[in-house]
Amino acid sequence: MGARVLVATTPGDGHVNPMVPVAQEMVSRGHEVRWYTGKAFRSTVERTGARHEPMRDAHDFGGMPREEAFPQHAGLTGITGMIAGFRDIFIEPAADQMTDLLALLEDFPADVLVTDETFFGAGFVSERTGIPVAWIATSIYVFSSRDTAPLGLGLPPSSSRLGRLRNTVLKQLTDRVVMRDLRRHADVVRDRVGLPRIRKGAFENIMRTPDLYLLGTVPSFEYPRGDMPPEVRFVGPFVSPAPPDFTPPAWWGELDSGRPVVHVTQGTVANDAERLLLPAIRALAAEDVLVVATTGAPLELEPMPANVRVERFIPHHALLPHVDAMVTNGGYGGVNTALAHGVPLVVAAATEEKHEVAARVSWSGAGVHLKKRRLSERDIRRAVRAVLDEPRFRVHAARLRDEYAARDAVVDAVDLIEGLV
C-alpha cells in the first residue's frame, strides 16, 4: 500500500519545476500525493497525477512579478535585497503556510512532507506533528560550515587554519551585524506559532534540520565541508520533463551550420533586458557565432543583429545539445541543466544568491563568473570568447556532465523519501 505524501512548494517556477518529476515518480509508485502550492500552478500539479491543494491563508504570489507581489522590494539590490527577499518571500509567510498545512492534515494525515528548502511552514508542521520532512533543494547548500564563508559573499571555500578563522570572523560579523534583523525576524515568526527559538545562523534560524536534505547537484559542484550533516545527500539535478509539444522554429537548422552556438538567457524571473540580455546580444553582434536568446517573457527587441535568433522559450533538452556556451544570470536550475549537457558557462549574477551559484561555476572550472554589477559589452565578449576558445572550460564542464550522468536524481530521491515512511 502506498504512502500519503504531502508536497508543499513556494509558488514560483524555480521551486515548483524541480518538484515535478519527483511528484510524478511518487505517483507512479502508487503513493497518494497531494501538492500544496499557488493556484497558478494547478495544471502543472495535476499533470503529475497529484491532487492540487491551493494556498488559503498563505500569501499566494504565484504568477506575479516580484515588484507586484512585494512592492516594498522595489529598488533594493545587493545584500539589502537578498535580506528583504529571504524575510518577506520565505520567512514571513511560514506561519500562514503552517495554518494551511495543518488544516489539510485533518483531512489527509500525511506520512511524509516533501518540500523545497525555503518552504519553512512545512518545517513548522514537522516540529508540531513529528511528521518527517524531506527537502528537495532548488538552490545551493544553505547551512553554514566552518569550511565556508557565510552565504551571500561569493567567496571560495577554505578549510585551512587561516581559512577557518576567516570563516568564523565573517560568520560572527554577518550574524551579529549584517543579518541581525533577519535572525530576529525568524525568532519573531517562530514565537508567533509557539515554537522555541533555535539560536542559529542567519539562514538556519527559522527551522530545524530536515530529516532529509536532497541536494540537486553533484559533489564536484558544491564546496567540500567536513561538517556536513548526515541528513544531506547528493542526488544529482532535478530536471523537469521535456514538454511533449515543442515545435522547433523555422531557423532551427542553423544550429548545425558549423558556427559556435551561444545561448543567452535571463531565466524565468529576472528579466531586466538591459541587465544582461541586450548587452550580450550587442557584445556578440560582430562575432562569428549564432546567438540564441530566450526572453522568458514578451519583449520588444527588434531590430536584431543578423546572427541573433530570439524566442520567448525553448526547452533546454532540445537546445542545449547544440550549444557551445551559455550566458546566464545564474539561476540554479538552468546552470545545473547546462552542466548536465557539458555546456560551459558565463554567469552574470543578478542577486547575491546567484553570485553564490556563479562562484561555484568558477570554482569548479566550468565557466567564468562576471562579478561586476554594471557589465560592459567588452566584459561579456571577452568572457564568451574565453569559454569558447580555452579548452579547459569545456573539459571541466564535460567532467561534471559525466558525474551528472552517473546519477538518477528522481529515483534516488524517492527511494530516500520512502525510507522516511
Swiss-Prot record:
UniProt KW Lyase keyword: yes
GO MF annotation: an example: UDP-glycosyltransferase activity
Superkingdom classification of source: Bacteria
Cross-referenced CDD domains: GT1_Gtf-like
BP GO annotations: antibiotic biosynthetic process
InterPro entries with a match to the protein in the record: EryCIII-like_C (IPR010610), Glycosyltransferase_28 (IPR050426), UDP_glucos_trans (IPR002213)
EC number(s) stated in the UniProt entry for this protein: 4.3.3.5
Intrachain disulfide bonds: none
Keywords: Lyase
Pathways per UniProt: Alkaloid biosynthesis
Catalytic activities: 4'-demethylrebeccamycin + H2O = dichloroarcyriaflavin A + beta-D-glucose
EC class name: lyase
Function text: Catalyzes the penultimate step in the biosynthesis of rebeccamycin, an indolocarbazole alkaloid that inhibits topoisomerase 1. Has a wide substrate range, including staurosporine aglycone, EJG-III-108A, J-104303, 6-N-methyl-arcyriaflavin and indolo-[2,3-a]-carbazole.
Family under the similarity heading: Belongs to the glycosyltransferase 28 family.
Protein name as catalogued: 4'-demethylrebeccamycin synthase
Organism: Lentzea aerocolonigenes (Lechevalieria aerocolonigenes)
Lineage of origin: Bacteria, Bacillati, Actinomycetota, Actinomycetes, Pseudonocardiales
